[in-house]
Amino acid sequence: GEYEALPEKMTKEGAQPDFGARPFDEGVARTGATAVGARDFLVAVNYNLNTTSTRRANAIAFDVREKGRPKREGNPITGKIVKDENGKTVMIPGTLKGCKAIGWFIDEYGIAQVSMNITDINTTPLHVAFDEVCRAAQARGLRVTGTEIVGLVPKRTLIEAGRYFLEKQQRSTGISEEEIMKIAVKSMGLDDLKPFNPKEKVVEFLIEDEKDVAARERLVRMTCKGFAYETASESPAPGGGSISAYMGALGAALGTMVANLSSHKAGWDARWKEFSDWADNGQAVMNKLLALVDEDTAAFDKIMAAIGMPKGSEEEKAARAAALEAATLYATEVPLKTMKTAMEVFPVVRAMASEGNPNSVSD
C-alpha cells in the first residue's frame, strides 16, 4: 500500500522515518510523508546500426541486456515460451549486468538503434557496453556506426572510455583530459549523428560556475607572454611562489613529453605501458603544480585583504590580527606544498633521463 499503509510502515523495524520521527497522529494523517531516494548515475545511450530492421535491433538488445530473452522450446524465435513451476517465464540472461535495452527505428535518422539504459556504470561502464553491442551486432552481420548519449554523463564515463581505447591501441594515457575525452568521442562515434560537445553533455561542466573557474585559473589561462608581462608589472603578485609552481609544472611537462615519446617509439612497443605509467604520473604532478600557480597568488591576496581590514576599534584590531595570522599561515603552507609537489617531478625525469628515448635526454 501507499498512503493507507503509512501507519503500519512507520512502526516497522528499519522503516522508521530518518527525519521527523513521530507517531502517526492527526498531523501526519494530514500531511503524509515524503520519500526521497537516491541511486547511482544512469547513462542513457543509443547505438546506431547500419540497418532499418527493428527486429534485428531487438535481437541485439536481447543478446546484451541483463534480463535477456525468453527461453523457448525448439525454435529460439517462434518456439513455445518455457515456464517454470510457478508459471513464470524462464529467461536466458544477456551478457551485460545492470543494463536494460530494446531495439527501435528512429524516423528522424532513418536507422534502427539499440536503446540502452546502463543502471550500474560501475559494473558495466559505457565503453564495455559499447564493445559488447559491437560484438553482438557483428555476430548478426550488422555494424554499430556510432553512439548517441541521451541526456548527461559524468566526466569519468568519458575519461574511463578514452583511457580504455588508448590502452587497446597500446598508446600512452598520460595526456590531457581534453584529449582523452576526444578519443572517447571518436572511438564510440558520439558525433555520428550530431556534433558532441562535452561542455554540453558532461555533468561537471554544466554545474561548475565558469566565472568561478576563470577567477580560480586567472594566471594559468594567460598566454606565456601575458604571464611574463603580468609578473614583470608593478603588481606584487604573481611572485616567486607562482613562478616556482609554473617552473615545476613545465619540468613535469617535459618529463611527461619524453615518457609519451618513449611510449610510442618504434621498436619499443613492448615497453609502451611502462612509459604510459610514467606519463600518467607526470601529468598528475603537472596538474597539481598548475593549480598551485593561482593558489599561491590567491594566498598572497588573502594577506593583502587582511592588511586592508579596518582597525579603528579593539574588536576590529582583534579581527584584523586573527585574519592576518590565518592568511600568513596559509601563505606559508602553499609554497611548502609547491616544494613538496615539485619533488614528485624528480622520479619521472630521473627515469626518463636513464630509461627514456635517448634522443630526448636533453629535454
PLM regions and their residue ranges:
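Conserved phosphate/anionic-ligand binding catalytic regions in large, soluble enzymes, centered on
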Residues: 231-258, 359-363
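Long, contiguous binding/interaction regions
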Residues: 1-222, 226, 233, 319, ...
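A structural-propensity feature for long, helix-poor, extended segments
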Residues: 264-310
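Amphipathic alpha-helical interface segments
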Residues: 41-43, 296-363
